[in-house]
Amino acid sequence: PVSKNGKTTLLASYRRSYLQMLFSVLGLPFLPTYNDYQFKLTSKLGASDEFYLIGLGSFDYNRLNTGLKDPDDDQKYILGYLPENRQSSYVFGAGYVHRFRAGQLRVVVSRNAFTNKLYKHERNDKSLPRTIDYNTEQSDNRVRAEIELRSVGGFRFTGGVGGGSGHYDNTTRRPAYTGGQLRTERFDSRLSFGRYELFATLSREFFGKRFSVLLGLRADGTTYSSEMHNPLRQLSPRLNLSYNFRPQWTFSASVARYYQE
């Protein structure tokens, strides 16, 4: 607990690997370092309301062991072609839950991102130009609101809306010989788009909860292309039937059609 009333709790951890020390002793030509962390914060705002914040991520670094004394041919080969790299990733999310007699309301916001960088210098000398320079970033942001009703005329209903955005960026630079001349190849790629969704499921049990029916419908749209703007063109229906004909046996059947983003 991090509050006096005990309604707010925090759980967190961090780890770091020291493989670079072991690899250095073994005389390996690369020295990795790995780090990861995670946390969860939960706060009860009242008898019916709760807020939570969660996250996990990592950041890693792999550098070359250029301090090797008298490296053999295998070590020289690896040092000659292997680039150094840094990469990191994380997922953060926050949510609010309001519970009431007939069900609950949940709102969730999240973001995840990944970054990767590769680079190498001539003869592993950082004062010389880079022979490889690669950078990529991608991220995804989402928001979702969902309501669950446990009894609507004997039915159970879940429905909601959501949306978000995605981004991808890649930049690459490297020297290349073309027609006997040295030039720098450049590659740049960027992509950004939005997304939105609607979804609902309706279910009910019959015959003393031995037979159940679930009907679901989902609609997805995105700004990636004009053909995908209208969510009514990307409808994903689903039907599931389940029958418990013996205490240890249940027969289930489902049919669905899904559109993948």
Ranges and model annotations:
Residues 1-4, 42-46, 95-101, 148-156, ...:
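Structural signature of outer-membrane beta-barrel channels/translocons
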Residues 19, 24-31, 50-99, 113-138:
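Flexible loop and strand-edge segments within Gram-negative outer membrane beta-barrel domains
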Residues 67-72, 115-117, 172-175, 243, ...:
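Surface-exposed extracellular loop regions of Gram-negative outer-membrane beta-barrel proteins
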Residues 8-10, 48-51, 102-105, 115, ...:
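Repeated loop/turn-to-beta-strand initiation elements of outer-membrane beta-barrel proteins
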Residues 56, 152-156, 162, 186-261:
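Structural signature of Gram-negative outer-membrane beta-barrels, strongest in the C-terminal barrel
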Residues 16-20, 57-61, 100-102, 111-115, ...:
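Transmembrane beta-strands of outer-membrane beta-barrel pores
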Residues 1, 35-39, 55-57, 88-94, ...:
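Hydrophobic, lipid-facing positions within transmembrane beta-strands of outer-membrane proteins
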Residues 1-29, 36-44, 52-56:
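Predominantly transmembrane beta-strands of Gram-negative outer membrane beta-barrel pores used
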